[in-house]
């Protein structure tokens, strides 16, 4: 086992568990100062959306690197965000471990051609202007209508997935 994602709920519990395990831990909760202070988790797993865009994500990854805390991306939720994290993963040395991909879970996507496809466990960084993807305007309109009808994804208010899974 390379790492265990969120084996317990809090950083404090992870630090206590650290006393009994050599397995690396990762967490979705974004609290870099606490991670440094407690020595756990070993890596923080987030996405571009949670940091407010590419620039702030790069700043966060650089801070993780400065404090020797690992960084991994979790699924980008859309092809746009996934394209961003593919580019950042290719460009930043500190993003050295495999990142999570949930492309097969996407019911629809807002980029031309639909969700990215894995080929032998690899997704190639999109090429072309900007992030290298084209918007599917019809799919984007459908997603916008769904947002207006249903509101944000349940985890959007928390910055992670924990509560949304517990409520289902």
Where are each of the predicted segments found?
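Conserved, non-catalytic sequence blocks in retroelement Pol enzymes and Pol-derived host proteins
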Residues: 6
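Shared catalytic-loop signature of beta/alpha-barrel
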Residues: 9-24, 29-134
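Extended hydrophobic packing segments that form well-structured cores
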Residues: 131-168
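Alpha/beta enzyme core
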Residues: 1-3
